[in-house]
Amino acid sequence: MQPPFRSKQEVIINAPLEAVWSFSMDLTKIPEFHPRVVKVDLLSGKTSREPGASYQCHLAGGKHTCIEKDIEIIPLQKIVTVLPEDTFGISKILSDYRVETTFQMLDHRSTKVEISHYYSTTT
């Protein structure tokens, strides 16, 4: 069962869907687009996203890290990621936290990316 929807961010990228998807599938590119991530360790030894691929993100400031794991990939449509472990306590408080990133071609030169957050709370 999926936890409740909590928030969503979206961005329009002036690039074709295939280019945006290809860039997003490369785990080594995360620091290039995520403002809080400065480095990624490939825990699964995989440079590309796939179900089961785990990676550790080092956050800006150097104090915190989080381990993320991709659990579902629908090519050119969706990436589902969970947060099994982190050093700032989110995974303990929100044990079912998951992120669904969806990709939608708007035209041949632009793509909408939506990042939706789901998690349960105790209250």
Model features per residue range: what roles?
Residues 17, 71-78, 102-112:
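A short, structured loop/turn motif at beta-sheet edges
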Residues 86-123:
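Beta-strand/loop substructures that line and gate deep hydrophobic ligand-binding cavities in soluble
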Residues 41-92:
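Glycine-rich portal/gate segments that line the openings of hydrophobic small-molecule binding cavities
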Residues 11, 40, 57, 81, ...:
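Preference for bulky hydrophobic residues occupying beta-strand positions
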Residues 19-24, 30, 55, 70, ...:
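Hydrophobic pocket/interface hotspot
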Residues 1-45:
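Hydrophobic ligand-binding cavity/cleft-lining segments
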Residues 3-5, 51, 62, 95, ...:
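Residue-level preference for beta-strand/loop junctions
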Residues 6-8, 64-68, 94-99:
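Short, surface-exposed coil-to-beta transition loops
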